[in-house]
């Protein structure tokens, strides 16, 4: 995996998918806890989860064509921007509508980051490296998801709902900066031959 991670395209792809996946899990594990803490009922939590699921999977019909048209980096940055907007909406209020809109935007952002990052991964490796590259990405996503899942409850209990949303901002910013750096970088010799 060291040789794969030496390639900027692979690093950007793995960071994008792992960050999107981990942050989505962090926020969505904390969301029902925050809603309960604000006195919202189980039905409201169920509706928020429904809208989040729509946000996660409904864009599947357009995410691929968006990547084809605008490219992996721009779509990844668009997904990251939606995570930022999601956090801002969550920070603006604690009503049912704030939770629902924020969670839906979080789902759409996750979808765009996942599709863009996965496609970007495919541009960074040779066909004979496919299984190793996919394994690297899956291990990264799963590891980050596990950490964020455990961290979510502790973070909301110790620091609150606002901290969960503020905490995702530096990670999303890092994804955007890495993707922007890729725009100006000439293709690496190892990637040029792929």
Regions found by a protein language model. Name each.
Residues 29-48:
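Short amphipathic helix-loop junctions that connect adjacent transmembrane helices
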Residues 59-72, 156:
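Helix-to-loop junctions at the C-terminal end of transmembrane segments
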Residues 86, 97-105:
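Paired small-residue
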């Amino acid at each position: 995996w060291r040789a794969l991670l030496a390639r900027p395209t692979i690093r950007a792809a793995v960071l994008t998918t792992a960050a999107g996946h981990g942050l989505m899990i962090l926020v969505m594990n904390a969301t029902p806890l925050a809603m309960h803490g604000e006195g919202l009922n189980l039905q409201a939590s169920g509706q928020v989860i429904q809208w989040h699921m729509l946000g996660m999977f409904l864009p599947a019909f357009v995410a691929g064509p968006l990547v084809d048209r605008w490219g992996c980096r721009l779509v990844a940055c668009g997904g990251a921007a939606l995570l930022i907007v999601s956090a801002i909406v969550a920070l603006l209020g604690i009503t049912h509508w704030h939770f629902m809109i924020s969670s839906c935007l979080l789902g759409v952002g996750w979808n765009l980051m996942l599709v863009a990052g996965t496609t970007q991964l495919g541009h960074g490796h040779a066909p004979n490296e496919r299984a190793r590259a996919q394994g690297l990405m899956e291990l990264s996503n799963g590891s980050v998801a596990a950490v964020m899942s455990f961290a979510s409850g502790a973070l909301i209990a110790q620091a609150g709902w606002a901290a969960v949303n503020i905490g995702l901002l530096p990670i999303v910013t890092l994804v955007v900066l890495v993707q922007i750096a890729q725009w100006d970088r000439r293709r690496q010799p190892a990637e040029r031959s792929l």
